[in-house]
Amino acid sequence: MKHRSLPLTAALAVAALGLTACGDSGSGGSSSYTVGINQLISHPALDGAAEGFKEAFTDAGLDVTFEEQNAQGEQATVTSIASTFANDGDVDLVAAIATPAAQGTASAVKDKPVVFMAVTDPKGAELVASDEAPGGNVTGVSDRNPVKEQLQLLKDVKPDATTVGIVYNSGEANSKVQVDQAKEAGKELGLEVKEATITNSSEVQQGVQSLSGVDGIYVPTDNAVVSALETVVGYGKEQRVPVISADIDSVERGALGTYGIDYKAHGKQAGEMAVKILKDGAKPAELPVGYADPANLQLVLNPTAAEAYGVEIPAELKDRADQLVEG
């Protein structure tokens, strides 16, 4: 397996020169492949997904060159990367990590397979016609998470909590879906949701400060916010307000806990779909969108963080945890 991470300008130059040697995309007959990876931004959850995706090819014994590009959170860069991959005849398949990256890639890449991961609502993001029958050249794995169970953690550690704050990027469709789910779950749990919208990670500090007075903070799988999680965690500890996350990696970075998916396993599931497309000739249009097996969801708690937030995790909850993180 080979990894090639070209500077974006160099990659664009290659495309502009028209160096488009024909690949053998999806035929199942090629002995080696080139896979482009369009990742929205770097943070542990998305990096874990990328790692798991590549691991699937190792396990399958395929000879693959990965061309990895990171848009650093810039949608214009997502589009440029996607266009480069679309015009590069050597690229057999494109992987897209996170909803904005998947949307930009699907818009630009029409004649080769696209496999997404870290996308909460594929149909709502207009990536597929339906989960069961995607219908085009795009399929992948959703990271839809159990929002109600995650918010329940706040009630478990702070039973008198009545409000929860959520900072999210208004430009990320996946985040809006989770906020709507949080509002519905909040009605059942007795939690009023207070929102603060941002447009990029540099606004997270201002956004979280606008949530003054809430009893807890919920961090959805919003890439702008997760990439600046330490800002949210720092505010939570300063104000003694517990921070609950939607992803496991954020617990290791200081959130109190979550009930969520393993992003490396999530990425590997997407990688296995890509292997089916390249090695076996499977058609994305006929590969149903994948979801995490509920049995594989993990309860991960950080008792040290809980203490910093001024709350204690009940012993019964600790006993049920799949993992206790210290730090």
Model-identified regions with their sequence ranges:
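Bacterial signal peptide processing site
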Residues: G23-S25
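Beta-alpha junction/loop-to-helix N-cap segments that form part of ligand/metal-binding clefts
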Residues: E68-A129, D222-K237, V241
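Hinge/cleft segment of the Venus flytrap/periplasmic-binding protein
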Residues: K276-G327
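Pocket-lining segment of extracytoplasmic ligand-binding domains
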Residues: A173-D247
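Extracytoplasmic "Venus flytrap"
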Residues: S32-K54, A60, E67-T77, G171-S175, ...
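C-terminal motif of bacterial Sec signal peptides marking the signal peptidase cleavage site
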Residues: G18-A21
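Hydrophobic alpha-helical segments within soluble ligand-binding/sensing domains
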Residues: P122-T163, D262-A282
